[in-house]
Every structure is written in structure tokens, then in C-alpha cells.
UniProtKB/Swiss-Prot annotation:
A lipid is attached at residue 100 (GPI-anchor amidated asparagine). It is a lipid-anchor; GPI-anchor. Induction: Induced during cell wall regeneration following protoplasting. The lineage of its organism: Eukaryota, Fungi, Dikarya, Ascomycota, Saccharomycotina. Pfam families: KRE1. Its main location: membrane. The keyword Amino-acid biosynthesis does not apply. The gene is PGA1. This is Predicted GPI-anchored protein 1. It comes from Candida albicans (strain SC5314 / ATCC MYA-2876).
Length: 132
């Protein structure tokens, strides 16, 4: 009888872990955005003690314009006080490449097919402790 209760508790715990680990942050799979996660260190005060923890920081970048949008811009001049410029031209920017050297591990690492396993385990433990 105790073994059955143990199996039920473990099954519920694992279900919570899987549910918490795969939340997809509400993003669409077919969107044109790309999610990039960076691990950052955050220093805070907890209970009067200084604590430094790592946490995931992510940004999403989307395309801000297309070539078709640029064709519809009318030519002309624009100014603000002593500042002036032209409208309708396509401005090019130099490209900066950022490398991945010496970065913290990202959540792209998959353990047994489960992303963010650590987050799911911690969330499951908090959930179980909350039920007690």
C-alpha cells in the first residue's frame, strides 16, 4: 500500500517537472523571432545577506523592415532645428559579430530530452512543499 502511494507521488512529481520544464514562454513555433538565452549573474539581498545567483536572460529580435517597405517611402527632406537629413534612401549599417567565447551554458543543453530540467525539478519541489 505504501509503495502505491509512493508511485503516485513520484508520478505526480514527474508530471509537474515536465509541465514546468516545457512552457515555451508563450512563443509561437512558427514566428519569425529567434529566442536566445544568456545566463547573467544577479546580486541581491535575501534575509539581510548578500546573495549572487545566475538566471536566464533572453531577448527576442524581429525584423523591423523589409525591402518592400523601403520602396514605399517618399523621397524628401526632414529637419529639426539645425539637424537635417534625407528621407527615402536606404541606409546600410556595418555588422558587428558577437562570439560565444567564454559564455555560461545556455538552456540548449538537453538532458534526457528535457529542456530546463533543473527549473522543472525546483518548481516541482516548491509545488510539493506548498502542498504540505
Amino acid at each position: 500500500m505504501n509503495f502505491n502511494k509512493f508511485l503516485i507521488i513520484i508520478s505526480c512529481y514527474l508530471a509537474c517537472v515536465f509541465a514546468l520544464a516545457n512552457q515555451n514562454d508563450g512563443g509561437d513555433d512558427d514566428s519569425k523571432t529567434k529566442k536566445t538565452t544568456t545566463w547573467v549573474w544577479v546580486t541581491t539581498t535575501i534575509g539581510g545577506q548578500l546573495a549572487t545567483i545566475s538566471t536566464a536572460y533572453s531577448q527576442k529580435f524581429i525584423s523591423t523592415h523589409s525591402s518592400e517597405d523601403a520602396k514605399s517611402v517618399a523621397s524628401g527632406e526632414i529637419g529639426l532645428g539645425s539637424l537635417s537629413g534625407s528621407v527615402g534612401g536606404i541606409k546600410t549599417y556595418s555588422q558587428t559579430t558577437i562570439t560565444n567565447a567564454n559564455i555560461a551554458p545556455s538552456n540548449n543543453n538537453v538532458f534526457l530530452g528535457i529542456e530546463s530540467l533543473y527549473t522543472g525539478i525546483v518548481g516541482g519541489i516548491v509545488l510539493i512543499l506548498g502542498l504540505l
